[in-house]
Amino acid sequence: MLFQEEIKKNSQDIAQVFTYKDIEENEKNGKISALLSLEEGAIYQREPQMLRKFYEQGVRMATFTWNYENDLGYPNRFYNPLEQKMWSAGETAGLKEKGLEMLEEMEALGIIPDVSHLSDGGFYDVAKYAKRPFLASHSNARGIAPNAARNLTDDMIRILAEKGGVMGLNFCVSFVRENWKPKEDGALLSELIRQIKYIICVGGEECIGLGSDFDGIEEAPSEMKNAAGLPLLAEAMEREGMLYSQVEKVFFKNVKRFLKENL
């Protein structure tokens, strides 16, 4: 597996984690922790045993969909080839029967359900049937950027927070910017901070982390082109009046708390 090959080549700096104890051990040894996750439920081939095989390979977090309908459920935005346009699934299109089976199997194995990319209806199904906290790894607030249907509504943010979950701030400009238009420059740090403050206002300080999606977005933030620029965001957050304790929560403490309780 390419993931494990890369880990092996860089083993002096990074190590795969399977449990929270592995994260603690990596911290002691000065190593970065890498948690293997899956994005796109079709890869499970509708079979719980496939999910078990992925778990054995170290998968500890997984989505139900990517950008297309599959046997588990619906994405929040998908392309309708008959009408040649993008559609939002909304609240009526939830998890399918196989999706509910996979949710149950995920929780039985210890794989954390990830609701990013999932339809509104799918989110509410996970919220209803999940027995443990879940997360949205790279989703923002729809209250600011409604053009991105994959963002979470205020109601979703509150539910996620009440259940002990976290959401990772996506740096993609269309997920960040109000009234975004195609071909605009990347998001500004001030726009990322506006999202962070909004999410904290809706769901509290414990529910927000970073889910940059650097490897999946076309336009990185204008002032932060890759992960090396993250200290710039931390500095900007303090300049914008956020407490250092809040910066710590957003950057690592909230996600660490979530993983300690659920990994």
Language model: regions and residue ranges:
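A metal-dependent hydrolase metal-coordination microenvironment
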Residues: 1-48, 64-69, 73-87, 92-107
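Structural preference for beta-strand elements that scaffold enzyme active sites
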Residues: 15, 33-37, 60-61, 110-114, ...
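Active-site beta-loop-alpha junctions enriched in small/polar residues
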Residues: 19, 39-41, 67-69, 111, ...
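Histidine/acidic residue-rich metal-binding segments in metalloenzymes
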Residues: 46-56, 78-135, 149-163, 190-206
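A conserved active-site cap/scaffold subdomain adjacent to cofactor or substrate pockets
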Residues: 166-175, 180
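Short acidic/histidine-rich active-site segments
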Residues: 170-171, 202-225
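Mid-to-C-terminal alpha-helical segments outside catalytic/metal-binding sites
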Residues: 225-263
